[in-house]
């Protein structure tokens, strides 16, 4: 889903989304086409051979190993670098997402991945499930969990972030500025395609690989960029309908 993620970052920085207001795909607007061209040109200019098929972990591993100086990712990179190649660990930091213009807001909505914890209404063990969730968020246990990967695991509870027993962790103190950058983005971001609420289209955008195939078509097959974008937009809309999406 790297192709979808990177294109999403670009169009979000331009104030747009990968979905139009009517629920159809947005790959042929001026901002989307500009983003496709930007990432295509960047790939051709600086990417290593074979990287066209990289997944999220492949790109992250290059950063862990000190083979690339940049990645769109989270605070888990702190432990990843420390484990794989410790020499650059004092030189890494999180920065706000790139902006179109210096005058644009530093922190704009882009992307957040959420893992919900729920107690199902139809569950036969609702009481036990609720008790388990309450146990997980017991202050001491929750802080212990957050400290298992400090800087990567970030508190969802505001009062925990103010707890001295949480904030006193050496890694958290060392990377406090970077952690704040990440938390600021988390507070305004949403899942790709869910900027206006849960939509079936969101899963299609990130799981079907259609945007990634579009990049293949442009880079490997030499397809004209606008032609490839129109074809991808058409295929995405067909996939949305097949998945039962509501299109206005």
Where does each model-flagged region fall?
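Alpha-to-beta junction loops
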Residues: 65-74
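Glycine-centered hinge/linker elements that transmit conformational signals in sensory
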Residues: 22-53, 93, 97
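Short secondary-structure boundary segments
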Residues: 1, 75-76
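Short, low-complexity disordered leader/linker segments with a strong preference
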Residues: 227-230, 234-248
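Extracytoplasmic/periplasmic solute-binding protein
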Residues: 1-25, 31, 68
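C-terminal lobe and pocket-closing loops
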Residues: 77-88, 100-209, 247
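Short, charged, surface-exposed loops that flank catalytic or proteolytic processing sites
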Residues: 216-230
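Short helix-initiation/N-cap motifs at beta->coil->alpha
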Residues: 51-65
